[in-house]
């Protein structure tokens, strides 16, 4: 009897065959996906690291530039004769106090106004010295312009005396020492004139500016007031 032939079974190949199974394909896809994710994460970390490095470098650069943006105050002196500004020194809050700076300023202004003789600015200097002086010291200064031998009558517009401040040392106790040079020459001369060197010892104080007139406060807003003034030739300097 011929029996029914059995139909051949389609073989399904596994990992040991030539064709991959559905299971193997799934494993391969998952492994490839994992590698792709790991590669993407490594790339992201590299980019983040690069940005972090750039941020640190920018911070260092900005910190290095901060000293360049620092505002350093300077004491500027304006020449009373020419109006030219002159930077004397930088001011360090740790080494130079505000009171010292102001004392030096007013002491220099006083000596310049009192020792300068210029026919064309004489009235202004005269008024400035009066406003910055006590009554007795102001009278002592004014006396040189009184009588037949008054300084303005002797010099007129023919002589000019200019002042150069050499150094100022306030001791913080109401006494200051100012070293200065005076150059005197006739206005019709072309030479350098005669220069002499002096030391002024000045007693001073600050009075309440509210007790002063408005015009005086415009010239002397802090109430600087000279109570004594003595000038001596500087020893050891060729006059």
From Swiss-Prot:
GO CC terms in record: plasma membrane
One biological process term in Gene Ontology: protein secretion by the type IV secretion system
Intrachain disulfide bonds: none
More details: Transcription of the operon is maximal in early exponential phase.
Protein name: Type IV secretion system protein virB8
TM ranges: 47-67
Entry membrane topology: Single-pass membrane protein
Induction trigger: Specifically induced within macrophages by phagosome acidification. Induced at 37 degrees Celsius in minimal medium, suggesting that nutritional stress is a regulating signal.
Broad class of the protein's primary localization: membrane
Family statement drawn from the similarity comment of this UniProt entry: Belongs to the virB8 family.
Subcellular location: Cell inner membrane
Function, as annotated: The VirB system could be required for the establishment of the replication niche in the host.
One Pfam family named in its UniProt record: VirB8
Gene from which the chain derives: virB8
Keywords tagged on the record: Cell inner membrane, Cell membrane, Membrane, Transmembrane, Transmembrane helix, Virulence
GO molecular function, a single term: identical protein binding
């Amino acid at each position: 009897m011929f029996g029914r032939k059995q139909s051949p079974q389609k073989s399904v190949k596994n990992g040991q065959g030539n064709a991959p199974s559905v299971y193997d394909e799934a494993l391969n896809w998952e492994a490839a996906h994992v590698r792709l994710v790991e590669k993407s994460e490594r790339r992201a970390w590299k980019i983040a690291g690069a940005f972090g490095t750039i941020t640190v470098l920018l911070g260092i650069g900005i910190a290095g530039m901060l000293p360049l943006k620092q505002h350093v105050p300077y004491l500027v002196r304006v020449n009373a004769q020419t109006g030219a500004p002159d930077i004397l020194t930088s001011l360090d809050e740790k080494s130079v106090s505000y009171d010292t700076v102001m004392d030096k300023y007013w002491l220099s202004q006083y000596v310049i106004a009192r020792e300068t003789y210029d026919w064309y600015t004489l009235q202004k200097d005269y008024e400035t010295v009066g406003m910055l002086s006590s009554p007795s010291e102001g009278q002592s200064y004014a006396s040189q312009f009184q009588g037949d031998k008054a300084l303005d009558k002797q010099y007129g517009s023919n002589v000019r005396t200019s002042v150069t401040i050499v150094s100022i040392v306030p001791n913080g106790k109401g006494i200051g020492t100012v070293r200065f040079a005076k150059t005197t020459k006739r206005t019709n001369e072309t030479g350098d004139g005669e220069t002499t060197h002096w030391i002024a010892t000045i007693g001073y104080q600050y009075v309440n500016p509210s007790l002063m007139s408005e015009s005086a406060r415009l010239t002397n807003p802090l109430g600087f007031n000279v109570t004594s003034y003595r000038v001596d030739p500087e020893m050891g300097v060729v006059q």
